[in-house]
Amino acid sequence: VFRSGRYAANANTIRSLIKLNYKVDSSFTPHLKWESPLGNSIDHQRSPEQPYFCKPDDIYNSSDSNLLEVPLTIIDSTKYFFFNKKIWLRPKFSNINEVKKIINYVKSKYSNNDYIVLNMMFHSQELIPNASPYTKSQSDVDSYIIFLDKVFKLAQKENIQFATLEEIHNIASQFLNNNK
């Protein structure tokens, strides 16, 4: 399993991961383009919102490679909720009402899929006071944990099952093989 720092994966990264026999990458941020002061940018605006097996020469299209891209769950609210914001399934980047919107949107949009994935991301340092800009105090960490608890309870209420990225690869491979 691989996740590029600062979501900086590009076609070269994907080709290298395939060559090194990685099974899962989770570096893509749908609907986002990351600008760099150096002039180079990482553009994941074309990334699918749901997992797919990466095509080495066209990283936003499916292929029969063994590298599964599991993009972070980010929705473009301008298309669905009429306000200009990218909503992340990530603590400190969204509130519980936005998480509900994300879940409802993904479940509705992908209801015909064999499986649906919601991919939440956070750094372990965010659970340590003053180790992250998002949690500067124990009170911040406590609020963070309360938020995570609300998300997990909401997921449970919505019958969402938890899985590791490796387990998602196994599920995706099973459906890919069954549909050949």
Which residue stretches match the model-derived regions?
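Extended hydrophobic secondary-structure segments that form protein cores and membrane-embedded regions
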Residues: V1-S4, M121-F122
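C-terminal domain-boundary segment and adjacent tail
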Residues: W88-K180
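Active-site-adjacent pocket scaffolds in enzyme catalytic domains
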Residues: S4-S111
